[in-house]
């Protein structure tokens, strides 16, 4: 028979009384009523707040969007293969946040900030809410510093400043992403942190872009946020806000940042899909009523901060895809009205061989003029007007048999200006090279050069300056002005290159 020792029992009881923890954990738990198409209807989450993160029992996360009388409509941020009718759902009391910090540079992440490039975890402890309020009026200052894209036609005619929102708009396959990638490549050595947000794109396209950035040494200062075409609509909807949050971290540290949203049309379509499945009333083109707010609250986060706030900036280049050049559709008109100007790319110009295919007539930068460097502003003032007039004359001259000499001369110069502004992909030019090329065209110094030789002339001019006039390039890059001495040097170089070229033609 087992002997019972009272002292042992009392010591066990004492131990249990000492270790007794009477803390009670209260969690708000609900039950899945219905699930499908990335949407869950949940009963019982009485205390949940709009936009709150939810946790399903298989670990999938969701966001509560519709708070109704008898149920909550939530979107799922994953496959949710383990979630079924009757599954438990817990509210977390948190809003979606994303990891931020220096360690994010050079990495490819999903909209939740999780790495998807196979390089392991990101060593950062800082986080930031995905949805943040935009800086107020007092925290901002006007745009006054240039954000050089390296693309001559943009920097000369549609300049972009740090803290500006400049829309890139055009049909599919007209070179919208190419302009954005060139701008990222041109920030090398400028101490600008870039964030490229790919929304609803093919995984192969994103992999190709990452490889291009890596080859040109641009991935070191770039964060790529990707929500592929196969991802749930909720992740495609969140991706731009994640990109903005990552850039905001650097902006509030006083750094210049550049964010590319490629493209917001697909984000709007993902949001429309979610809204219709949540049974929200459809409006124009079946988009929900708050689709304007979807984009305005995102793009308002781009700003040039005041000196008291550290002087950082976030420049946003949203991309919008049009159908058959129709800029009067719902989403294009919304984003045009929110942004500080647009760069319009034309399929006709692209197919005619003009690349970048910028339609100068309807492209505009509303605030970038104040940020343009004096060197390029001095010589490019008439460039936009001349090209716009050339387009009109070119259309008119197709029907006119005999043209007067002045018109003929204007047409010839316009053709040469067009050729000068052609630029291959992934080859951004610095300020001095742009000044030299534009000066040669605007001042009529290459009117004698045959049109088909203009591109070759521009290349030779740039090479000559690099080899023989390095001090000219240094002076322009340092002073950002074209004084009389530099202008005389430039004219001399242009004439020299032109003479040697015409001698061989």
UniProtKB/Swiss-Prot annotation:
One of its GO terms (cellular component) is plasma membrane-derived thylakoid membrane. It comes from the Bacteria. ATP binds at residues 170-177. SUPFAM superfamilies: C-terminal domain of alpha and beta subunits of F1 ATP synthase (SSF47917), N-terminal domain of alpha and beta subunits of F1 ATP synthase (SSF50615), P-loop containing nucleoside triphosphate hydrolases (SSF52540). It is found in: Cellular thylakoid membrane. It catalyses: ATP + H2O + 4 H(+)(in) = ADP + phosphate + 5 H(+)(out). InterPro entries: ATP_synth_asu-like_sf (IPR023366), ATP_synth_asu_C (IPR000793), ATP_synth_asu_C_sf (IPR038376), ATP_synth_F1_a_nt-bd_dom (IPR033732), ATP_synth_F1_asu (IPR005294), ATPase_a/bsu_AS (IPR020003), ATPase_F1/V1/A1_a/bsu_N (IPR004100), ATPase_F1/V1/A1_a/bsu_N_sf (IPR036121). The keyword RNA-binding does not apply. It is a peripheral membrane protein. Keywords: ATP synthesis, ATP-binding, CF(1), Hydrogen ion transport, Ion transport, Membrane, Nucleotide-binding, Thylakoid, Translocase, Transport. Belongs to the ATPase alpha/beta chains family. This is ATP synthase subunit alpha. The gene is atpA.
């Amino acid at each position: 028979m087992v002997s019972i020792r009272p002292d042992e029992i009392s010591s066990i009881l004492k131990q249990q009384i000492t270790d007794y923890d009477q803390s009670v954990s209260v969690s708000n738990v609900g039950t899945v009523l219905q699930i499908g198409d990335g949407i869950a209807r949940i009963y019982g989450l009485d205390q949940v707040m709009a936009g709150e993160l939810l946790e399903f029992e298989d670990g999938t996360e969701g966001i509560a969007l519709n708070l109704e009388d008898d149920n909550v409509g939530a979107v799922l941020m994953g496959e949710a293969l383990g979630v079924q009718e009757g599954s438990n759902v817990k509210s977390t009391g948190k809003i979606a946040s994303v990891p931020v910090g220096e360690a994010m540079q050079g990495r490819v992440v999903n909209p939740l900030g999780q790495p998807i490039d196979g390089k392991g975890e990101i060593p950062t402890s800082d986080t930031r809410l995905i949805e943040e309020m935009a800086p107020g009026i007092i925290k901002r200052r006007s745009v006054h510093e240039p954000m050089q894209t390296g693309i001559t036609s943009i920097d000369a005619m549609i300049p972009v400043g740090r803290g500006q929102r400049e829309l890139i708009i055009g049909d599919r396959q007209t070179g919208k992403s190419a302009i954005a990638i060139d701008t990222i490549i041109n920030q090398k050595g400028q101490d600008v942190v870039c964030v490229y947000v790919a929304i609803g794109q093919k995984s192969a396209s994103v992999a190709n872009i990452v490889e291009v950035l890596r080859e040109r040494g641009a991935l070191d200062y770039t964060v790529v946020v990707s929500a592929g075409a196969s991802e749930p609509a909720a992740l495609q909807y969140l991706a731009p806000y994640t990109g903005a949050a990552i850039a905001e971290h650097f902006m509030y540290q006083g750094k210049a940042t550049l964010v590319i949203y490629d493209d917001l049309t697909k984000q709007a379509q993902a949001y429309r899909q979610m809204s219709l499945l949540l049974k929200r009333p459809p409006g124009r083109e079946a988009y929900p009523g708050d689709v304007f707010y979807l984009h305005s609250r995102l793009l308002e986060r781009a700003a040039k901060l005041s000196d008291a706030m550290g002087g950082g900036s976030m420049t946003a280049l949203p991309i919008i895809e049009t159908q058959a050049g129709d800029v009067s559709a719902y989403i294009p008109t919304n984003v045009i009205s929110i942004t500080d100007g647009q760069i319009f790319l034309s399929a006709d110009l692209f197919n005619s061989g003009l690349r970048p295919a910028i339609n100068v007539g309807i492209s505009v930068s509303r605030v970038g003029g104040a940020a343009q460097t004096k060197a390029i502003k001095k010589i490019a003032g008439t460039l936009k007007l001349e090209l716009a007039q050339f387009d009109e004359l070119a259309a008119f001259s197709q029907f006119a048999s005999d043209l007067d000499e002045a018109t003929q001369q204007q047409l010839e110069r316009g053709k040469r200006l067009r050729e000068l502004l052609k630029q291959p992909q992934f080859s951004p030019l610095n300020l001095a090279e742009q000044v030299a090329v534009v000066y040669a065209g605007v001042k009529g110094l290459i009117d004698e050069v045959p049109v088909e030789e203009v591109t070759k002339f521009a290349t030779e001019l740039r090479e000559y300056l690099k080899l023989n006039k390095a001090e000219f390039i240094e002076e322009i890059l340092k002073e950002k002005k074209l004084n009389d001495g530099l202008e005389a040097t430039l004219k001399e170089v242009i004439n020299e290159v032109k003479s040697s070229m015409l001698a061989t033609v």
